[in-house]
Amino acid sequence: MEVLMAERADLVFHNKVIDGTAIKRLISRLIDHFGMAYTSHILDQLKTLGFQQATATSISLGIDDLLTIPSKGWLVQDAEQQSLILEKHHHYGNVHAVEKLRQSIEIWYATSEYLRQEMNPNFRMTDPFNPVHIMSFSGARGNASQVHQLVGMRGLMSDPQGQMIDLPIQSNLREGLSLTEYIISCYGARKGVVDTAVRTSDAGYLTRRLVEVVQHIVVRRTDCGTIRGILVSPGNRMIPERIFIQTLIGRVLADDIYMGPRCIGVRNQDIGIGLINRFITFQTQPISIRTPFTCRSTSWICRLCYGRSPTHGDLVELGEAVGIIAGQSIGEPGTQLTLRTFHTGGVFTGGTAEHIRAPSNGKIKFNEDLVHPTRTRHGHPAFLCYIDLYVTIESEDIIHNVTIPPKSLLLVQNDQYVESEQVIAEIRAGTYTLNLKERVRKHIYSDSEGEMHWSTDVYHAPEFTYSNVHLLPKTSHLWILSGGSCGCSLVPFSLYKDQDQINVHSLCVERRYISSLSVNNDKVGQKFYGPDLSGKNENGIPDYSELNPILCTGQSNLTYPAIFHGNSDLLAKRRRNGFIIQFESLQEREKELRPPSGISIEIPINGIFRRNSILAFFDDPQYRRNSSGITKYGTIGVHSILKKEDLIEYRGVKDFKPKYQMQMKVDRFFFIPEEVHILPESSSIMVRNNSIIGVATRLTLSIRSRVGGLVRVEKKKKRIELKIFSGDIHFPGEMDKISRHNGILIPPERVKKNSKKSKKSKNWIYVQWITPTKKKYFVFVRPVIIYELADGINLVKLFPQDLLQERDNLELRVANYILYGNGKPIRGISGTSIQLVRTCLLLNWDRDKKSSSIEDARASFVEVSTNGLVRNFLRIDLGKSDTAYIRKRKDPSGSGLIFNNESDRTNINPFFSIYSKTRVPQSPSQNQGTIRTLLNRNKERQSLIILSASNCLQIDLFNDVKDYNVIKESSKKDPLISIRNSLGPLGAAPQIVNFYSFYYLITHNPISLTKYLQLDNLKQIFQVLKYYLMDENGGILNSDPCINIVFNTFNLNWHFLHDNYHNNYCEETPTRISLGQFFFENVCIAKNRPHLKSGQIIIVQVDSLVIRSAKPYLATSGATVHRHYGEILYEGDTLVTFIYEKSRSGDITQGLPKVEQVLEVRSIDSISMSLEKRIEGWNERITRILGIPWGFLIGAELTIVQSRISLVNKIQKVYRSQGVEIHNRHIEIIVRQITSKVLVSEDGMSNVFSPGELIGLLRAERTGRALEEAICYRAVLLGITKASLNTQSFISEASFQETARVLAKAALRGRIDWLRGLKENVVLGGMIPVGTGFRELAHRSRQHNNIPLETPPKKIFEGEMRDILFHHKELFDFFISTNLHDTSEQEFLGFNDS
């Protein structure tokens, strides 16, 4: 090489491998030393040598050259181990999905990065002349990332949306990919191909816009005479030396530089490498340099402000088109880099945080008051410190002090023992970097179907008050309680209600019909009554033919009923214990329009019937009236059926048990209609008392009468009662004969003879004596409606006789009750009908036996669901009433869950027992729960949760563990097994004494109560039933394991405790097991036996627990929950949405949009937003400090200078992160163009510019000086597109965008284009004013320079201006130190303006 270059003795011989960067540096040194012509000869020789060597050795690539890194195996294994632990934590609910994702990215990113760093040393040691190594290291072909994929591992890939796929590709291309890895790679490759195409065009367009903005900027003068400069401090530690050198080299000094008394640099001297080295060694004062920002010319630039030309080492020539060079040098790396990066195929890059490690082993100590507990980004517990925290680590011989910067996370606890090099703190990365964070939504989908449960309060998000989007206020768990759902679409409303029980054998097993089952297998006092559903015997729908329809009355039959709730509006508060069976009356009487009627079945809230209780009632439509009136019973003096205090309130039926007295039978009653209007006192009445009116007479201003007849007006307290009686008037003959007929009913044959009309009346009449005045009197005869009452029908032996039953059956009697007392006026509310008679079904039993031990019956509704068809049955059990009922307190809030820890008490509804003084030391609490239909937004399909006893693992006390599925075959022979698992009634225990049951044989272990509950030393043998607690909207269905109809998705785990119940808990964890409590996986409930699945305790027995499987999902505060509490989720439904920040991936492709956003000043971007805000802030503050005229001037000046520096630094950062070096002055020329305009504000009135007009800053300053008055303006940031459309040349604007609009506007305004730029001249075919074409322009302008300009006489303003603007280092330094300290970039500190 030495020989080839030149035969010179003084050249130094270098023997080392050089890459592209080193060659660049070499060439620039050669140009400095030898000049251009000589250097090109040297380079030609170098090229020849290179080609010769390459062809001689035939550098090529073989597959054997790809050497895998030896340490890869154990690194990958280690990462997999960490991922496995992470997966476990996520499964236990300690870490949520976003934290898991972040952590797994960091685990694999760190592994991948480590392998990448190992790569070069590995090649260098094992095979330095490996062709792969040579090519990638020299940068000739491929980069480190690609080689890393060939011999390291591909790592994490992005999907087309730019999201990370959390399955890393562990293989490299040398080993070959597995099928899954190949498919994931294809994602990345496709993203690469698409992005390359899109981004190349983006980069091209960016270049076009950049050139458009600055095409007219040409070097036209040698010196503009400015004294301003920008300070760069060599002693600033924040700026790396490389960037410092790059900033200064080729610039021109704006001021002399002194080193003590000695001047080491003169003004207008260009800075070479020698001068820079002197600056660095001497650490001089800040150096003031000239930049394009400080140039005073408006539409061009001078040589000294631009500095050296990048092509050769001298000052730039006059006439050089530096604007176009600047635009292209910024745009070009974009195109190049898009093409280059993307051959790595969408490999994901993340960032890792900086760590502080312990210097030695020892105990760590710090002040706990200064830290706050928090969670790290990965879900680990940590402490956050807000100020500098001093941490001491005491080892045996030495004490180390470590300072932890503010906003760091401390990962260890106080007094913890740490080992050397253990990570003790994490410095928050990215507080000052440009890596823009973007907010990403991550949806979490549920893995299983089930019921939603929250363990904390949840806010309604304000914009969705009525929807099901909720915001979490604090970190908590969401639980999905497992359970299948069953939708029933045939019945219009779902019938599953509170306190439902379902019999085990009432569902058809293998498509058998249920009719035989329900009669023969029903050995308990379990009564079914149900209306008939005929037909549909195909498809295994049960046939109810043997259960004939009951409840026949004279007029109506129950046929094809539909069953409704008491309220059909599902969202209303439902009546809990009843529903109405609607039916149509068979003979619709003369097609009258009647409201639908139905049988209402009511069960008392505690579910207990005494004798002669009303089981159901039926409001017969024929006893229904729309008008007011009075009832009279058949004969005068008939005893009232009801005692007075037991009158039933008809509307809003409460829990009533009226004591009915059946002393006398009433076979008919009478109803005397009348029209009644109740009016306020103030109303003006248009009729007189005792006058006779016709139909539709106006009574008041707004009311007309519906019937004609006699008017009676009575004044009562604060109101007027207006009655209209219809009927005939009779004037009697003899007074004494009539008197006894006052207000009585007269049968058809006993009509008065001596009235004028002595006709025979065919109907009953009601006679009233009326005296309008003392002398006048007459008899008013009113028509009467008569109602016949049928006798009570006794439906004895209603239900089929049970074979094994020893007692009599229940019987039902029909009784008619008149709802209103004798002679009581009945007031109808307009539009509602009045029911006069209610037909009731009375429940009775054991009438023949004198001493029956059974005092009450327990009733509940039973639902049977087969093939989606739901039937409702009533089940009645007879029993003695000597058991203590556990009743629910009357609590409006509904039953909630009882939690163990205080913090989770969301909705607690305690239940109390009869033994109020009971102290329960550690016994399982037994609670009653409710069942409810779930409210779906879909009104057509109601869904409900079904609990089946399959998947129910039973661990018997005496036998070994049996899986329930194994027992299935033997269940027909041995009834005991089905008993232990058939789920008992909800809530209160039924009477077990007389419980002759095929299902519930008395096989529960008798327990002596004193052993566990101290019930005032009351010793009893108690049958323990399995108690259930469901949360608010649960639904339970007992069913057989063999049934396929019911979804068997309810996982129950039977968990047994040992006999010595108290000593059985883990010693460390004093768990108190309470019903409804949630357990995480592997929590220790009993000694030595951690529970294997997470879930909720729903049954507590003395020797066992049943746990309903549940899956916890952790959600941090700010997450949104998408479902209501208790709603049913299906697999794959959206459960939670997390919003988290992630740094955008570092690609130039992602970088290009960043550069574009900065240059276009787009508001979506945080950079320009902060700049805009900052500009406004400076404008206000400075104006406030300095007053108006100076404030605007200096404010705009300062603002513009500061924002320019900020923009330059931001753009440089993006390119530098990609390893692209662009000289600052190119970016400065562009930034100068987009910040050189100011907006005239409306504050000051000036005659020159209109408010809102955009003018150049220098023009504004000059006009202000010329006019000697202040022009108010403020700085604005224009984007490059806007700046291109706001130039001095309309031809250039028209050739860029919106041609017609620009030309039309220019024509209307009469704009003049001076053809100063390149584009205008190209469009018009003239000579462009650069290079040789510049000479003529220069020649012309010299002639103009000789004409002297007249200066205005007053120079005070100019002098003051100079004082402030040109000798204002102190002032500006003051401003920058006080007002501009919040600038976000590091380089500011060394790149401040003077």
Swiss-Prot record:
Q: Which one Pfam family would you cite for this protein? A: RNA_pol_Rpb1_5
Q: EC number(s) for this protein?
A: 2.7.7.6
Q: Which reaction does it catalyse?
A: RNA(n) + a ribonucleoside 5'-triphosphate = RNA(n+1) + diphosphate
Enumerate the InterPro entries for this protein: DNA-dir_RpoC2_beta_pp, RNA_pol_beta''_euk, RNA_pol_Rpb1_3_sf, RNA_pol_Rpb1_4, RNA_pol_Rpb1_5, Rpb1_funnel_sf
Cite a GO CC annotation: chloroplast
What keywords are annotated for this sequence in UniProt? Chloroplast, DNA-directed RNA polymerase, Metal-binding, Nucleotidyltransferase, Plastid, Transcription, Transferase, Zinc
Q: Where does Zn(2+) bind?
A: C224, C295, C302, C305
Lineage, top-rank taxon, reads Eukaryota
* GO biological process terms on file: DNA-templated transcription
Q: How is the cofactor bound?
A: Binds 1 Zn(2+) ion per subunit.
GO terms assigned for molecular function? DNA binding; DNA-directed RNA polymerase activity; zinc ion binding
This protein's cofactor list reads: Zn(2+)
Enzyme class, first EC level, given as a word: transferase
Subcellular location as annotated: Plastid, Chloroplast
Q: Which family does it belong to?
A: Belongs to the RNA polymerase beta' chain family. RpoC2 subfamily.
Any idea what job this protein has? DNA-dependent RNA polymerase catalyzes the transcription of DNA into RNA using the four ribonucleoside triphosphates as substrates.
Q: How does it assemble?
A: In plastids the minimal PEP RNA polymerase catalytic core is composed of four subunits: alpha, beta, beta', and beta''. When a (nuclear-encoded) sigma factor is associated with the core the holoenzyme is formed, which can initiate transcription.
Q: What HAMAP family does the record point to?
A: RNApol_bact_RpoC2
Stated name of the protein: DNA-directed RNA polymerase subunit beta''
Its source organism is Cucumis sativus (Cucumber)
Recall the taxonomic lineage recorded for the source organism: Eukaryota, Viridiplantae, Streptophyta, Embryophyta, Tracheophyta
Source gene?
rpoC2
